[in-house]
């Protein structure tokens, strides 16, 4: 009797295993389907404004003001881009071109100065032991607790006394004041994640402390430096409040201020605002795509320690 039932039990066991495997595969399919659907929904929400910005930059004004809204414009034109870069000699085009140059100079200079000062300060905080080290780091980071509008008046009075109003140097000084603490915070954590023994070995071979920093530590900290530089560049590139208050001429105006001035007294040029937004977003996007693999690793290593 037992021998006769064995094939039947074996078939039932095989069928049960197949059924369990089928249920597991269906659960995995449902799980990954949900993950992909959620990722698609989030990506759509994130990318939709930028897609609409691109459409608005090439759409005819009649399409932008049409009711109901036309998601696909009937007339496509790149005249706004050509007016800015090719043949445009209007005040709007001149202002935007000057603002583009100003933003590149101010953001780049602010990042270079902040990295130089912040890396040295972060290395000292991570490697040296001196009184007030932690207190100084906390005080520098506490500047982020104040809203920007709260320190506008002191900064404005300082700029007046130093004769730096409406100058690129003035904005560079202001931007360094909040990029440097960010650099100090990220890089101090990154330096602590690098083994001290590597620097000790370099110093045994004859390197000074500064030489060990330049030849050993900085090459290992390159991902953190790139991540910090990118975020510092974004802070300076997108800043609006200080640039609006401390500048008044095309000699020092940045892109956010120039885009805001596309709004006239009696009319709003939505197409030019969209064109300016697209052009302003290209440099940060390009930098982010090129160095994206360093950004996550750099920030995570700097935040863990």
Segments (PLM) and residue ranges:
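Short, Lys/Arg-rich, polar N-terminal cytosolic tail immediately upstream
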Residues: 1-26
């Amino acid at each position: 009797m037992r021998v006769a039932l064995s094939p039947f039990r074996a078939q039932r066991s095989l069928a049960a295993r197949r059924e369990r495997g089928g249920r597991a595969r269906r659960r995995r399919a449902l799980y990954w389907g949900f993950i992909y659907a959620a990722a698609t929904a989030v990506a759509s929400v994130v990318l939709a404004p930028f897609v609409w910005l691109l459409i608005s930059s090439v759409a005819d004004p009649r399409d932008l003001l049409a009711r109901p809204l036309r998601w696909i414009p009937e007339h496509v034109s790149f005249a706004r881009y050509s007016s800015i870069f090719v043949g445009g000699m209007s005040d709007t085009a001149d202002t935007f071109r000057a603002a583009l140059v100003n933003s590149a100079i101010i953001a780049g200079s602010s990042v270079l100065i902040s990295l130089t000062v912040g890396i040295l300060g972060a290395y000292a905080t991570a490697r040296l032991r001196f009184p007030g080290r932690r207190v100084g780091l906390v005080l520098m980071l506490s500047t982020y607790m104040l809203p920007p509008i709260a320190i506008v008046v002191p900064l404005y009075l300082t700029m007046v006394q130093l004769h730096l109003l409406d100058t690129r140097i003035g904005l560079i000084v202001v931007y360094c004041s909040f990029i440097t603490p960010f650099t100090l915070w990220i890089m101090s954590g990154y330096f602590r994640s690098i083994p001290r023994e590597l620097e000790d070995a370099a110093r045994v071979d004859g390197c000074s402390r500064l030489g060990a920093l330049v030849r050993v530590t900085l090459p290992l900290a390159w991902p953190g430096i790139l991540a910090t530089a990118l975020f510092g560049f974004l802070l300076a590139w997108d800043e609006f409040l200080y640039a609006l208050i401390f500048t008044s001429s095309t000699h020092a105006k940045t892109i956010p201020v120039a885009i805001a001035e596309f709004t006239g007294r009696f009319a709003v040029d939505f197409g030019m605002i969209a064109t300016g937004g697209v052009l302003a977003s290209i440099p940060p996007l390009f930098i982010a795509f090129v160095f994206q693999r360093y950004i996550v690793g750099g920030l995570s290593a700097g935040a863990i320690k």
